[in-house]
Amino acid sequence: MKMIRAVVRPSKAEEVVDALAESGCVALTKMDVIGRGKQKGIKIDQIYYDELPKTMLMLVVEDDAAENVIELITKTAYTGSFGDGKIFVSPVDEAYTVRTRSCGL
């Protein structure tokens, strides 16, 4: 299994969530976060924003689905401008459902 953490623009988050749901990935966690990338913030007129609001989507998928999910997120969140986001992928050894105490997705 893979954990996918996608940090995207808040304005694109619902579009990404909807695209994931349409592809069958309905289980995810969505969080509002604040951060910055390589460009270290943004300056608009005389105001400098050190950190910018983003939305983080976290989901766990089977290994064979990870590449398609990453492609879907990348395609849907893309604007072509700085700040489109980042996707992090990590291995997941096990996942447990609290209610049923079952292991796996």
From Swiss-Prot:
Q: Which InterPro entries match?
A: N-reg_PII, N-reg_PII-like_a/b, N-reg_PII/ATP_PRibTrfase_C, N-reg_PII_CS
Give the matching SMART domains: P-II
Q: Is Transcription a UniProt keyword of this protein?
A: yes
The record's Pfam families line, in alphabetical order, gives: P-II (PF00543)
Chain's role: Could be involved in the regulation of nitrogen fixation.
PANTHER family, alphabetized: NITROGEN REGULATORY PROTEIN P-II, PII-LIKE PROTEIN GLNBI
**Which protein is depicted?**
Nitrogen fixation nifHD region glnB-like protein 1
